């Protein structure tokens, strides 16, 4: 599937810093240690609605990772999926009286436009679950053959499930206890109480065909895949059995990333699936997480239509630390617009060199993407009328992705 155009990323003098990131699996900020080609998989959208600021904040966080690796001299192989077949998409299409494929294509196109406006570097591989269907069905059959998957004894709908005991370390990525995992499974699309499952936490691999639902042929019979196996297969087949970073929002820690890691590790025989599991915090509005189910969404496209500068949006979302849950408000946007204006005025100045400011940007981002510290240093630069603007503007463009000139 086509992604979106890449923004230009200027080169900046000096040497990039090695990046340290928080790893959900260890609870520690650890160095990333990629080889010449750094590899990253970030879970993409389920395209049944427009991109909201919660989505945008996640993709901006991993865009910073991408930019820091480039600055440190790595090539980056970035893969992102699109969950273009899933229950929420089908439900929304039925509600609106449109085909699920037409709805998905429309929202994917809008997402591309939003990412372009926000100057997010695109993935090298942008893969829909539907286009990877043959790969996914082969992987499900492989898990069945290995004894890691089974059918529930349901005469009408003998769906295929993954046996979580097959991984030998289920739970290591999230570090949640069983009660928490069961609660989150029930809240986030799982079915822990379905009869016939070996373990309550066993996730769905293949849903056999239901009336009035799209389905695909497979060795297991017609049906469609579960969510987690799609990401395991798309990442593994394009990057390899071990990746440097798996990323997404903090709501994906469990069950999605736990289960996709377990699938990938059983399929490849190698562990861990990712050297870092890194997660972005949630964006809230009026005291609640911004989500489609709550209907409290601020859409990127709507703000763009209102004439909001996408660089102000980007700067507003980067004002808080990426791992923190944080609130969006009119005040956040107003502050970001004022800051952007100050920085743009400073970027046009001539004066004494500001190499120390460029180094402060690198140092702050290298320390678990500490954007608040970076922004503080840039505010001080903007306030000092003796400092030159050109080198700092290039660094802000290259590393923060905010265009000042």
From Swiss-Prot:
A motif ('ERGGDP' region) lies at residues 187-192. It is an enzyme of class 6 (ligase). Catalyzes the ATP-dependent condensation of GlcN-Ins and L-cysteine to form L-Cys-GlcN-Ins. It comes from Nakamurella multipartita (strain ATCC 700099 / DSM 44233 / CIP 104796 / JCM 9543 / NBRC 105858 / Y-104) (Microsphaera multipartita). The keyword Membrane does not apply. NCBIfam families: mycothiol_MshC. Its cofactor is Zn(2+). Keywords: ATP-binding, Ligase, Metal-binding, Nucleotide-binding, Zinc. Gene3D superfamilies: Anticodon-binding domain of a subclass of class I aminoacyl-tRNA synthetases, HUPs. A motif ('KMSKS' region) lies at residues 289-293. This is L-cysteine:1D-myo-inositol 2-amino-2-deoxy-alpha-D-glucopyranoside ligase. The gene is mshC. Pfam families: tRNA-synt_1e. Binds 1 zinc ion per subunit. GO terms for molecular function: ATP binding; cysteine-glucosaminylinositol ligase activity; cysteine-tRNA ligase activity; zinc ion binding. Belongs to the class-I aminoacyl-tRNA synthetase family. MshC subfamily. It comes from the Bacteria. GO terms for biological process: cysteinyl-tRNA aminoacylation; mycothiol biosynthetic process. HAMAP family: MshC (MF_01697). The keyword Iron does not apply. Monomer. Zn(2+) binds at residues 43, 231, 256. L-cysteinyl-5'-AMP binds at residues 43-46, 58, 81-83, 227, 249-251, 283.
